[in-house]
Amino acid sequence: MHVITTQVLFIFCFLLLIHSIETLAYATRLSGARVGFIASALSLFNVMVIVSRMSNMVQQPFTGHLIDDAGKNALAIVGEQFRFLIFGSTVGTILGIILLPSFVALFSRAIIHLAGGGGSVFQVFRKGFSKQGFKNALSYLRLPSISYVKGFHMRLIPKRLFVINMLITSIYTIGVLSALYAGLLAPERSTTAVMASGLINGIATMLLAIFVDPKVSVLADDVAKGKRSYIYLKWTSVTMVTSRVAGTLLAQLMFIPGAYYIAWLTKWF
């Protein structure tokens, strides 16, 4: 059986899109602080997170079907396929970073429309997906330039936040994949292992909400109120997205050990 199949490529593109959306979600806070509408920016951020989470749930049955089709030598084949999918997460995150400056400008307009349209997300999407909306969006597209790193200092990088977000991203990236692989390692407890994926992703989401999001949100508020410089929020956001790349790379190392840990953990349920 071939490792790279049409279905694997489909899931690869799906994960690429999911991680691009999650990376670009960080642009909403930058945009909100830029135009002074933090609450509206948070609303747009929540929409993007919900879309990415829902998309992640949609791809899970397709990923699970890879195991059903693996046949003989499933551990080796599925292991290679899942590593390729994790690579898709890395590519998607890098794509999100490349598009970040463009989407900061794009989301700034979207947030203004959201605030001016009475908080109607539907109206924002209707304008955004119109013919004129596409033309306007294309005018904002630009590749990152060397000027984007102007004013950079190492002291602007919140190192603890980088490590925390990297670990959380790695857990979230392999949550479903390690759980499915654990089902192959312990076939007699495969259902228990697969169901554990929801718990793992739930814990990762909770850690993100407790340790990462509040710090970035408070910083965005301070910038909007003029208490701190915009450059601090900019480099905190850059820290977050680069730590996401590091997290997806760390996920390659954690994938198999994570699967064995889940397989062992299922003994206690």
Swiss-Prot record:
Keywords: Cell membrane, Cell shape, Cell wall biogenesis/degradation, Membrane, Peptidoglycan synthesis, Transmembrane, Transmembrane helix, Transport. It is a multi-pass membrane protein. Induction: Transcribed under partial control of SigM ECF sigma factor. Expression is up-regulated in the absence of MurJ. Disruption phenotype: Mutants lacking both murJ and amj have a lethal defect in cell wall synthesis. InterPro entries: Amj. GO terms for biological process: cell wall organization; peptidoglycan biosynthetic process; regulation of cell shape. It is found in: Cell membrane. GO terms for molecular function: lipid-linked peptidoglycan transporter activity. The keyword Cell membrane applies. One of its GO terms (cellular component) is plasma membrane. This is Lipid II flippase Amj. It comes from Bacillus subtilis (strain 168). The lineage of its organism: Bacteria, Bacillati, Bacillota, Bacilli, Bacillales.
